[in-house]
Structures are given as C-alpha cells and as structure tokens.
Amino acid sequence: MRRALSLLICVLTVSNLFAQSGAWQQRVNYAMDVDMNVQTNRFTGKQRLEYWNNSPDTLRRVFFHLYFNAFRPGSMMDVRSRRQGTIQVGRGLDWDQRVKDRIVNLKPDEVGEQTVQELKMNGRLQQLINHETILEVVLDKPIAPRSKVLFELNFEGQVPLQVRRSGRDNPTSKVRYSMSQWYPKICEYDEDGWHPTPYVGREFYGVWGNYDVKIKIDRNYIIGGTGYLQNAQQVGYGYEKMGQVVNRPTGDKLIWHFYAPQVHDFMWAADPEYVHRSLHIRDSIPATKTSPAIPELTLHLLYKPTNDKAENWEKILTNAARALPFIEKHFGVYPYKQYTFIHGGDGGMEYPMSTLLIGPGAWLHEWMHSWYQGIFATNESLYAWMDEGFTTYAEDRISAFLDADTNFAFLGSYRGYVNLAKSGREEPLTTHADHFNTNAAYSAAAYSKGAVFMEQLGYITGAAVRDQILLDYYDKWKFKHPTANDLIRLAEKRSGMKLDWYKEYWVNSTKTIDYAIDSLWENGKETMIRVKRIGLMPMPVDVQLTFADGTKELHYVPLDLQYGVKPIEDTAIPRKVYAPWNWTHATYTITTTKKLATVTLVDIDPSQRLADIDRKNNQLKLDWSTPTPVTVQ
C-alpha cells in the first residue's frame, strides 16, 4: 500500500512546489452519498465539499455546474442544437447527430433535472441563484485568499433519457445508466477568474482534488467508473480478490464505495447485465534515484453483448496491454492504479480513470484522453485542440504501432484540416469551443488541426526533439492545467528555437501554408531551383532532389523567425543547410552542383509533414527523354 501511494505523494509534492513557485490552482475534496431509485430514475444526494482558495483573490461568490438541466425542452443546449440543424454544411445539415431535435421532444419523466435544495458554507445557509446549468452562490462572507471553506449541499435529480453523454436507456446499447456530469460540480477559478460556462454539450474544465463517493443502488446492478472500489469484498461482481468470500450485506440495495485521488471529475455507469472482465497489467514499481514510483495497474471492462460481439469487446483489454509500453515510452506513465472501459449509452467520452463507449472501436482514442484530458486537464473550452487534437495525434501514432503500419500515420488528420481550410468555414483555434459557427468547423479544428499541430511541430524541430518535448510536457505540466503558451515555451527550451510564431499563425489565425516549385535553370556550374511561397503562413522548407543515378540531396531552408536549425533526421541523405528564409520574401533559391539534366524529381516536403493545402505544386518530375526539357515558370 505504501508503494502504491508513493506516486500520489510525489504528485502532491510537485503540486505544492508549483504553488510555492508563484503559480497557484484551486483544490477540492468531495465526499458524496447518492441514492438511486431505478424505478423512477431519480436520485438524491448529499455533498461535503472542502474548497481551498489558493488564489490571491477574495471570492464573494462561487459557481456550480448543474449539467442535467441542459436536457430540458427550451434549454440553451436544445435551442442551439435546433439552430445548427438549419445550417447547411456541405451535403447535409450541421446537426450533432446524437442530439438533433431530441431534447425538445422529451417527456416530463424523460427530462434531466438537477436541483440543489440547500447549500451551506461553514454551517451557514447561502443565497442561491439558478441560471439553468449554472448555480450562482452569493456568499454571506467572502472566502479570503489562501483559505479553506466547507460547503454542504443537499441535491436531487432525474436521469434524462439518453441524449448526449449522460443518461439512461439507450435503445441501441441498452445500458441503463451512464452517469456523467451527474452531481453539482464547482466551477474552476484560475488566473482568468471564474469559468461558469453554460452547458451546451461541448467541453469541460474542473478543479483538481479527491473524490470519496458512495452510491446506493439495487443490489443486482453492477457499477464501474472513476476511482478505486473500497468495499470490493462486500460487493463482488468480479471486483473481489480471487479466492476470497464475498460478504454482501442484506437488503434490497448495495452501497458501492469509490475513492479517486487527484482527479477533476467523477463518472459511473450501472447496469444489471454488465459482463465484467479485468486484466492485471503490473505490480507497483518502487521509485529509484532517476525515476518516480510507478503504481500497480489493473484494467477493467464492463460491457453488454448488445450492439457488438463479445469477442470485439474483450479484445480491448489485450490490445490495451500490448499498447501500454509504447504509450508510456512516448507520452508518459499512466499514474493511477486502474482504468475502466465501460459500455455506455453514448460515446466514446472520456473521464478520469474511465471512459464510456457506445462500441469497442473508440477504446484507444478515449484511453489516450487519460493523458490529454485526464492528466493535463487543460481548459477544454479554450484549448479543445490541445485535448482532442493531441489525443488524436497519439491515437494515430499508437494505431500505426499496433498495426505495424509504416505508412504516414496522420494522413486522415491532414486531409481533415485541408478540407476545413478550403471550406471557407475555418475559424481560429482560439475560438471558444461553444462559439464556433458550425459543429463541422469545431470538430475539424479541434481534432484534425490540433493533431496536425503536433506532427508538424516535429517537422519544425525534428521528430526526435518533438518526442522529447512530449515527455517534457508530461513531466512539467501533469496535474497543472497547462495553456498553449506553457507548451510553446517548453518546446522552445527543448528545441533551442523560437516557436511563438508557429502558435501565432497556426493557432491564432487561419492563414494557410502553400509552397510551390517556381522555376529551374542552370547558372554556370550550378543548377538553380526557385521555390515560391503562395500561402500566407511562412514555414521552414525541406526540398529533396532526386537524380538520374538514384542519389538524393535534401536542401533545408530554415525560417528566419525560428532562430535555429533542426537536427539531421535521415543520415542516409546528404543535407545542405541554407541561410534563413525571411518571412517577408516570397521566393528563395536553392542550388546544387549537379547538372540540371540529371535532376529527375524536385519534391517539397517529401515527409508530407508540412500541412500544405495544395500538394499538386510541390513536386516536379523531369523527363529528359523528351526533346524539350520541362520547366515550371
């Protein structure tokens, strides 16, 4: 037990040092008891919330999320979804197909409900103001900087018919309860102030802390979710220690007791027909002088063989075990003792230590969210591309490893981005996730353009340096809510380059990359190749020349704004490094001592990592068997 806790102690120590360095973040301890009525689909709960105001600010009010209230006719989520259904995007409408106009048609016993009946701070009742999915609490006494208070809440709710993420009784998966966003959750407060974001079905941002949750439900239900089950021997259902007797209490209901350290949310799901499988991956590994302790790890799977075959579900555990060494080598150690893949009413959708899956296909994407949503916990509303995009990047890379596929792993993401850039619908990645004009633009930006950011960073810095940046990012920013500036500054330190220009162009604008071969000619003993920048986003450029004898040369032109040169990536091909290309200049000329007549191919960006929106002008094949040489003007 001491070994298993050593990583958490290390994490908390790092968090304290983080606070002492001048930065700060709020902290919470939740203790919740909830009682579910499976006949009425209603629940009641009590919450004790210890809240640390580690900020230098005096807080005169606080805010809580009440997500279930979005699933009511006329809600902001309902109105927005129906509005998007009037917008033509390509050949269809801009619906979220899972939501569409379903909320407006919910009956009274199908809607969602979340009500805080009373709330006390340090034993005193507080004034409550409801704003649909946000509860504003006007405090009778301000919370002083660097102080702690205790909130006590009584709440009740109704589980909505499954629409999006949370809910019950999906007719396809036939899962009874997918309980995400189910409790009053305090909003995050950071250096930008409060984040009381009304829920319209998009992203999340939570406070780091510990969750102690007891769920009372009919004794034939099986539960999985966030955290470590504390009373496995009283519950059973495959959680008990092998060979030991299960001692279930008498009565119609069981209490499931979970504890989740150092997380920012808590999800659970329940169904009487779940099949539970588990796979123990490793025992705990003690800390050494050069590395922290690594906790033991067990993977769990809860599924119903309804909308997919059992064998497809059960492959998840073996595939995850096979992927884990590669994942931890490139993206950092998984820091918790368990992870649960859960067949849910919607998904995939990620939560700390767990995921909801509508089918087995999305398991890898959702698991990698444990890093970019679970461990880093960036503000997803402001930096969705740092969560969805980096998760997609990791998924693509790991999938290639699992499939032993040597082709370019990120082609789908690059195509998704290029289609967005050419659609006329693109908005900057800095757009708040809730406020993109179209769902289509949001999805392509967050997933595709975000993934391209990371692979293209490797084009700029060199892939090996980018890989070290990923590990540096994990080591420095896990459990700390990093921003885009935090990532860029860290990447600059590792690469020795200036990279703020990359963020300004790629994240803050919609300017595009387009380079072309302009012309070729001989000048004495040299062959000259002029490259032209057509797009408005400048980049360093790799130009590869192939000659009639099969030999190749790589000509590397750094960008002036980067103030550095990437390392050689392929020692088998000679590389020539040029003086930087000034971003103000539209053309640049490279040279080779080989005769023009020996050049058979000029190729801008042979690695395909440059997100060039028109690759047709990136290559020039020369056929010297024709009477007149081919030249581009």
Segments (PLM) and residue ranges:
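A surface-exposed beta-strand-loop module
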Residues: 52, 92-172, 580-598, 607, ...
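Hydrophobic alpha-helical and helix-loop surface patches within well-folded domains
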Residues: 19, 27-28, 66, 258, ...
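Hydrophobic helix-coil surface modules that form long, contiguous segments used
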Residues: 185-193, 201-364, 393-396
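Solvent-exposed beta-hairpin/edge-strand motifs
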Residues: 61-124, 179-180, 216, 220-221, ...
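Glycine/proline-rich low-complexity spacer/linker segments in large multi-domain proteins
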Residues: 76-89, 156-211, 608-633
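Non-catalytic accessory/interaction domains
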Residues: 229-232, 464, 477-633
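Short, hydrophobic/aromatic-enriched beta-strand segments in well-ordered soluble domains
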Residues: 47-49, 66, 147-161, 211-219, ...
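N-terminal, polar/Ser/Thr-rich
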Residues: 13, 19-44, 171, 499-501
